A protein has these predicted regions:
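Metal-dependent phosphoester/phosphodiester hydrolase catalytic core
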Residues: 4-400
């Protein structure tokens, strides 16, 4: 194989998009969509950019009537902390493989320093912000919700499929995710309509389309019509992504038994926090909408679920959970709180740090607060989180 173009300038009329995710020390997932039916598609993977000395997946079938021409490859037995390149071989045409290639880097379970970008609220798949992110030296991108703004209010899986296709096919976002592995948790506009919850008409279709299109980490609830909460680690950092939409009860209900997470997910979340103690000095909770807010100040955040927020906050304090921070989206702003305003437990003191990062491609808006370091609404914004872990007692984190 011969590499002809920079990775961010490649095009191939046979491939709509490629993206990777679910990256661990020795595994990764690549999902792609092609523009024609084929009964012989395989993934070519190499540690070399020109794809020399490659390994090959088993052959897959792409059929518009069977799988929407989607192909997903689960990669195993990879080497830790290693850069990989990949491409699709379609109909045994080896010459076209390097026309459209992507890359990802595996992680390590040992202490490691790394940086990643995070952001939310992407109404458009095009914009200079995606190209700026692509030029950062990052290990992955964390999308914290509203990957698209289709606001689908019907149980029509083809509408959800089209939403992913429109955002990824031939767009700046698609090029970013081809070359930067991602982790992604939805919020309301990409799960269902505005402010949506478990009563959304398209709940089942949304869940299934996510599992079809997104190269996600294993879903602890299983597969099929299930919530999409998941977790993964990079070195000694544990990431916990909660599904704040598809199990949530309506926020305007008057019952004190309202829930964001649902009983099963909440038990899983608490257990993850307990299991992390002594193993992961840093825990990153990806919570897609505002935690810091008071009832009457917002229309969709945790302020409408004060009893459950208090329960979770008390659990964190009572179990002496250390090293927790939160990444959030939904609000179209950059905002940081150092813990001054995030404690909703019955015990006085500081809470955990909170970082909102957005909007990628949406006009600015302010939600929640107050935030100790201020809030800055705007479009074309994202965050960076840098982790320095030398294996000692402390891990240094910088948000910017």
């Amino acid at each position: 194989y011969q590499q002809d173009q920079p990775l961010d300038e490649q095009t191939d009329s046979l491939i709509n998009f490629l993206w990777s995710g679910g990256v661990t020390e020795n595994t990764a997932k690549v999902t792609g969509q092609v523009s024609m039916d084929s009964d012989s598609i395989r993934l070519v993977v190499s540690t070399r950019k020109d794809l020399v000395s490659s390994t090959y997946s088993d052959y897959k079938i792409a059929d518009s009537t069977i799988n929407n021409r989607l192909v997903t490859f689960d990669l195993r037995s990879l080497e830790p902390n290693t850069q990989y390149y990949y491409g699709l071989e379609i109909d045994n045409n080896a010459e076209r493989v390097t026309n459209y290639t992507g890359k990802f880097k595996t992680v390590s379970n040992e202490p490691m320093s790394f940086s990643f970008a995070l952001g939310a609220c992407s109404k458009s798949g095009n914009g200079s912000v995606y190209n700026t992110i692509a030029n950062d030296d990052i290990l992955f991108f964390m999308h914290t919700g509203d990957l698209h703004y289709s606001d689908i209010g019907s149980d029509n899986i083809n509408r959800f499929r089209s939403a992913y296709e429109n955002q990824l096919s031939g767009t700046d976002m698609g090029r970013l995710f081809k070359n930067t592995p991602m982790a992604y948790m939805w919020d309301d506009h990409d799960y269902g309509p505005n402010n949506s919850d478990a009563t959304a008409p398209g709940r089942n279709s949304s869940r299934l389309a996510y599992q079809e299109f997104v190269p996600h980490y294993p879903l602890d609830a299983g597969s099929g019509d299930v919530p999409i909460y998941q977790s993964f680690n990079v070195g000694r950092v544990l990431f916990i992504l909660t599904d704040n939409r598809s199990e949530r009860t309506p926020y305007r209900a008057s019952s004190s038994n309202k829930t964001v997470l649902g009983s099963q997910q909440k038990a899983w979340f608490k257990n993850k926090l307990l299991e992390a103690q002594g193993t992961y000095p840093l825990i990153v909770w990806v919570n897609t909408f505002p935690w810091i807010s008071e009832q009457g100040e917002g229309d969709d955040g945790w302020e409408w679920y004060q009893e459950e927020r208090n329960e979770i906050a008390n659990f964190i304090v009572d179990n002496d959970i250390k090293g927790l921070c939160m990444l959030s989206g939904d609000a179209h702003m950059i905002a940081i709180d150092d813990g001054t305003n995030s404690n909703y437990s019955n015990t006085e003191g500081e809470g955990f740090p909170v970082f909102h990062a957005g909007a990628l491609s949406r006009s600015g808006s302010y939600k929640g607060g107050p935030y100790s370091h201020g809030a800055f609404p705007g479009e074309g914004q994202y965050g960076l989180m840098s982790v320095e872990d030398r294996g000692g007692d402390e891990i240094k984190v910088v948000w910017s």
